[in-house]
């Protein structure tokens, strides 16, 4: 009976609890992506993660989008705390592609091919245009070189993995990734090359049904333009401290990952609390 009463009260006075369609935008930023894991943990505790129907991510945001969709939160935390510090620093590379491939093998990406799981978009840039982008940016609009891939429509799990590798292939630090369309692609977060590091666009274009969109930034100064006539409510979560810029992007040490992950959790809780939202357990009582 107590649970029924609580649900009735919430339906009258806290409609936000029952908003059914959430979209999640995850930014790029290499090692700073641990922040998004902390945010995701908070979203789960607040009952929001369970209502996410679509993700849009760039670079590490794309990797996390797939991971959050296909793995339990505890497993995501374990991968970041135990696997990332070892695998992504092997082979004397800034970001080991070999290690990243091994990490992706630990995630059941075939779940993206099932309709019961959220949609996941990732952003990448055609590599053949990067040099021309630098030379000709003042003359040509290169926005169409940014490619948005909906992973759920891909029939080949191997191609899903390749698209996740492509969205996180940092120029000059890792090799471009050849996809099934015959083009080479690089990290979608490099906006000087035509990328989009805060990929809100796929949600705006394809998902008008969303009740709320949560945008997670990895830089406390970042800001994306949100249309004034957007019907969905937008909640922005950003670090309240500097995550050390580019140096933070290539820092995969365990202490840094733990610190940044905790920061993401704390910042998310602060934002959600300010929106008069509460952990799911707060709405239930023992019989």
What is the predicted role of each segment?
Residues 18-55, 66-287:
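Patatin-like phospholipase
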